[in-house]
A protein has these predicted regions:
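Conserved alpha/beta enzyme-core scaffolds, especially Rossmann-like or related mixed alpha/beta domains
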Residues: 1-46, 60-72, 93, 200-211, ...
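Non-cofactor substrate-recognition interfaces
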Residues: 1-8, 79-89, 96-252
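Amphipathic alpha-helical
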Residues: 25-54, 59-61, 150-171, 175-184
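Polar, glycine-rich mid-to-C-terminal structural blocks
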Residues: 29-30, 59, 66, 70, ...
């Protein structure tokens, strides 16, 4: 209606929006939550989808990815993981600056995973890790080679050019759900319900096309992360901490 358009900066429009919000509030349909929104540090405001679709906004860039080790808490483990050795989950991320805000690890319930026994390529100490079966060749290539028997691992010497690895067990992501792990960077805890953090959850977005099949999850920063955290039962809390005014703010 070009003769009578609505214009967002007019008093009539703004008063109408506030009236609608009041009706929603009076019907007890409004609640306080936390969502992930594009934000402009320069403008100090959220950014609309229209602004994000302006020419030149999106660019193809090369990301640096990180594979981090998360240590499983050795309590009430399923039989296929119940041993006396430390086990680490290999989680992949292209946003390593969000690792201090990690509160969950996400797997695919139907994806097949493996427990691998090998040696740390930096310390040459024995280590056991979990990752997706389909990504073994991507992560364990170059300096690594597979052996058929666990006993062959004992033949490894730190001066060797090649590091052996042995597939100890196979299972699906569903078997890992609910397992707890140690917080990676212990700077702070979520201000609310920290006891529900640092556990393995399911996410439909997890694939085996790249990474490890285990996704570092920081609900404070990622839209997908925030969604799966809210869908988890109980919900995964975001890494929000209280500032000097007692307000919950992201840990950056």
């Amino acid at each position: 209606d070009m003769e009578d358009p609505y214009i967002t900066y007019t008093s009539k429009y703004m008063e109408t929006v506030w009236w609608l919000i009041k009706q929603i509030y009076n019907k007890d349909l409004m609640y306080k939550g936390y969502t992930i929104q594009p934000y402009s540090p320069k403008a100090g405001t959220a950014i609309s989808s229209h602004e994000l679709n302006q020419p030149g906004t999106y660019q193809d860039v090369t990301d640096t990815s990180v594979t981090a080790q998360f240590k499983i808490i050795n309590e009430n483990l399923p039989d296929f993981l119940d041993n006396k050795e430390d086990i680490y989950l290999l989680a992949w991320t292209t946003t390593p600056w969000t690792l201090p805000s990690n509160t969950a690890l996400t797997v695919g319930s139907k994806i097949e995973y493996v427990l691998i026994k090998t040696y740390n390529q930096y310390t040459y100490k024995p280590i056991e890790v979990i990752l997706a079966t389909d990504l073994i060749q991507k992560l364990f290539s170059g300096n690594y080679f597979e052996v058929s028997h666990e006993s062959e691992l004992l033949e490894f010497e730190s001066k060797s050019n090649k590091i052996p690895f042995y597939i100890s067990n196979k299972f699906i992501g569903k078997d890992l759900l609910g397992l707890k792990y140690e917080q990676l960077l212990k700077y702070a805890l979520p201000a609310e319900n920290p006891e529900n953090a640092f556990r393995i959850i399911h996410g439909d977005f997890v694939t085996t096309s790249e990474g490890t099949g285990i996704v570092h999850t920081a609900p404070t920063f990622g839209a997908d992360d925030a969604l799966v955290a809210k869908q988890a039962k109980p919900q995964i809390p975001p890494m929000l901490v209280k500032d000097k005014n007692g307000d919950l703010v992201p840990l950056v």
